[in-house]
Amino acid sequence: MGANTFGKLLAVTTFGESHGPAIGCVIDGCPPGLELAAEEFAHDLQRRATGRSRHTSARREADEVEILSGVYEGRTTGTPIALLIRNTDQRSKDYATIARQFRPGHADYTYWQKYGIRDPRGGGRSSARETTMRVAAGVVAKKWLKQRYGVIVRGFLSQLGEIRPEGFAWDAVEDNPFFWPQAAQVPELEAYMDALRKSGNSVGARVDVVAEGVPPGWGEPIYGKLDGELAAALMSINAVKGVEIGAGFGSTVQKGTEHRDLMTPLGFLSNHAGGIIGGITTGQPIIVSIALKPTSSLRLPGETVDVDGHPVQVITKGRHDPCVGIRAPPIAEAMVALVLMDQALRHRAQCGDVGEMSPCILENVGFRNADD
């Protein structure tokens, strides 16, 4: 099974299944000298973890990272960093009734068609459990980016079903289980999710990620465009069905005079490009958004077929998220950070002696457009 590694100078390989003994990753290409301890992974892993609120899966994993290699006396050595997390709360019996059925909307059918065999326990390799190791690898990338360049990568839930934020404050994002930027709306979200969970249904969501402090010049033209690599990385996350960068699909209704980001000696006047033009960073905040579909693991019966092609009714038991988007911000942050670190290393390798060319336009608008 291929395609378990991504990145060029910073290459990350993940392995393991949802109900296997462990999951892990290997980070190859991290520069030496970065201080790193197992305890540093706990914060972001807990942000992603299930069981954080009644609105996520009830599965409870300790998610304690073991550093197997690549770190000596608390510092990275420049050799591959191997991380391992042992699974401790599997409940494989929940999947006994669907072992020979294809759950609609899941990868059961496509894995079966491709490999002729599949692990039905929690989706096996296709489970969102795999994203735990992306978040772990992202901890390394976030720390390196912040220390080396002052880059900060943050995400938030920007839409839950039809509900959108009525205001914005970064301080609010980490103070509620929804990563929601408007504290006053949290009771509304709680009530919405309670009703949804009782009905046995699920709902989609949107997550925004903002990378601030990124220098101009990162990325490559044509086939190595930064926005292309960000899109590919984010589309690899479970349940993601769409990616926007900057104004995204909203640019289809804009005029050129609206969309172009005018420049002055004091900075850009807007950021419809999302911080990337021609595949290369402008120095403005990078703004990306992802659309996550509603999970197909439902207690409501639905039509499907079994491995013999016979029609059956499927009801998915077990512990599942009624909205996978609620836990997605740390995952999306990690993927953005890993792509940026890889691009930073590539830029340093090819163009490290170029520096920032004059004029370097100052950033004078935040991640939200000045005309929003």
Curated annotation (Swiss-Prot):
Its cofactor is FMNH2. The keyword NADP applies. GO terms for cellular component: cytosol. Reduced FMN (FMNH(2)). It is an enzyme of class 4 (lyase). One of its GO terms (molecular function) is FMN binding. FMN binds at R125, S126, S127, N238, A239, G278, K293, P294, T295, S296, S297, R319. Homotetramer. This is Chorismate synthase. It comes from Xylella fastidiosa (strain 9a5c). The lineage of its organism: Bacteria, Pseudomonadati, Pseudomonadota, Gammaproteobacteria, Lysobacterales. The gene is aroC.
